[in-house]
Structure formats: C-alpha cells, structure tokens
Amino acid sequence: MSFPEISSLITTLNKLHELLSRGSHRGYIVGGFIRDWLLGKGTNDIDIAVDGNALSIATDVAKELGGKFVLLDEANGIARVVIMEKEQQWYLDFSSFSGDIESDLARRDFTIDAMATELGQFIGYECAASGFPEKQSQLKLIDPFGGKNDLENRIVRALSDQIFEADAVRLLRAVRLAAELDFAVEPETERLIRCYSQTITKIPGERVREELLRLLSLPRACYHLRYLDQLGLLLALIPELGEGKGVEQPTVHFWDVFDHSL
C-alpha cells in the first residue's frame, strides 16, 4: 500500500476501534485481508469479526463514521459498511463470533483464510511500520491452523472435509484461489474435491457463475479448465462436454472434440 492508503486505513480502523471500545466489544480482522496483507497485496475489503450483534454494530458504525450500511446476509448476521476516508473507499464486512476467535476461525474454509489479529494490535503494528514510533508493537497473529506456513509454501489447504459439505461452492473457490495467487492445491484437498465434486450441482447457478467468471478472467484460463476436469468438477458442471472426449476430428484439427471445445 502507498502511504496515503496506509494513512487512510489507520484512520478508518482507529475510528472503528474507538467505537467498539466504547461499547465494550472486541473486534478482530480476519480472513482474506490478513492473507493479502501478509502477501504484501493491497486490498480495501476488510472482514471484521465482533463479539456482539454484527448487524447492530454495523448499523452503529455506518451512522457514527458516515458510511453506508449494506445488509449482505440477514440469516447469518453479515453486513457491510462502505466508508470513504481520505479519498480511499473501504468495505468493512461485519460478522459475529461467540466464545473465542479460534472457534470462529475453525468454521472457515482454507488455512490461509483462517488467520486473525486483534484490531488494536493491527493498528499499533501498522503505525509502527509506517513511521509512528510512539506506537511500537509486534503483531500477534492468531493462526491455529498453520495458515502462515501454508502461505509461505504457496499452498491452498482445506481445514477439513466438512468445509465442502457446508458449502460446495468452496470446491471451485479452492481452484480459483490457487489460480489467483499462483499457489498449488495440496494433495489431500485435491482428493476431497474429487470426492465431493458432484455436490457442486446443488449450488445455485449464480454462485457457480461468479466463481467460474473470476477463474476464466485469469491468465491461462484453458489450463484452469483442464484442472477442473482433472478434479471432476468440469463435467459435473457441464456433463455434455464429456461426450467429446476421445472423439477424433478431421486431420486439419489436432485435438479431439473435448480439447477443441476447451
């Protein structure tokens, strides 16, 4: 991030931290923001886990900080607050956790997305790293499943087989995440994807479409489609493609019908 972006981020998170503290709430930065931050990638999407009613807290945050409240998932209590700070736009996604943050992380999908840090800790660390010596601190990363190690080894690893039972769109997300980051899906996770590949047919089409479009927008799209086929996902989604496997074409064509279709 550039200095203006870091300054805007610190200001936004400071305001949020002060608001949560007034209500005696704990807040943690979790998931994709931590992953991307450790990779040195800038992002303006920040997932915040709070120990209270996330919808109520998000409503208060939008009101106090002059942001826009967006209800994302009423059933699961997830809301977004869009905030403009110093010409930078931030998307704060709020969810609730009960008990300890480790239990919340255990319900996530992949190890590299199952890391967190306390909000105040992150602010202190970023201030120190950005030339504010009055707030020297060391970031305390909450990483019960070895996500940082997998991040360093460039691996996408499922927390358990239950993640695919809970939401089969994660089958596609594993491949898309690996493709975006230029990571590898680790062998046991590949085995689980093959095992659960047919369950992708139970997912609403719009969710499948979103993941596929994101995957196809990346470089080497044909390679990613072949990988989906190796994992049993491609034919689960488009079974008609299977009819072209091994069907030869006139000599002017090098590939069979299936490969030509890809």
Predicted regions: what is each one?
Residues 1-262:
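Catalytic cores of the polymerase beta-like nucleotidyltransferase superfamily
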